[in-house]
Amino acid sequence: MIGHSTQEKIEKLVQSCGCNLYDLLLLKENERSILRLYITKEVGVSLDDCAMVSDLISPLLDVEDPLAGEYFLEVSSPGIERPLKRPAHYQHALGELARIKFADKNEIEGEIEAADETSVKLKGEEPIPYSLIKKAQTFYRW
């Protein structure tokens, strides 16, 4: 687990590149430990942005060493179909389509019309408290 102090330092470095830290995940895939950073930018994230963030963060991670042992650092955009985990994610996705799943396995889809610190509202629906949401993500109707 990455400590709060290290995460704040990562966030400041990402912001110094003109980007925002969207999410930070520690995971294992095929026996490999991965530290995955998702970054966003108003005009879209380029490969150069990802490389710049990676180059800035690598020395910090060498000193802070958030994971015991070897790991891979990945920096990318969260993509067009991205998870919605925090109120800020919903607020930045206003006007986009979202799929929301509840603990009882029901789900709802719709355009995000409003979002605040406690709930999200899809067009034509009542506000949904975040506490009722098990999983949510934006989606694109192809």
Swiss-Prot record:
Q: Which domain of life is it from?
A: Bacteria
Q: Does the keyword Cytoplasm apply?
A: yes
Record Pfam families: DUF150_C, RimP_N
> Keywords assigned by UniProt?
Cytoplasm, Ribosome biogenesis
Q: Tell me a GO cellular component.
A: cytosol
Q: Where in the cell is it found?
A: Cytoplasm
Any one GO biological process: translation
Provide the function of this protein: Required for maturation of 30S ribosomal subunits.
Q: Which family does it belong to?
A: Belongs to the RimP family.
Q: What is the official name of this protein in its record?
A: Ribosome maturation factor RimP
Q: What is the lineage of its organism?
A: Bacteria, Pseudomonadati, Campylobacterota, Epsilonproteobacteria, Campylobacterales
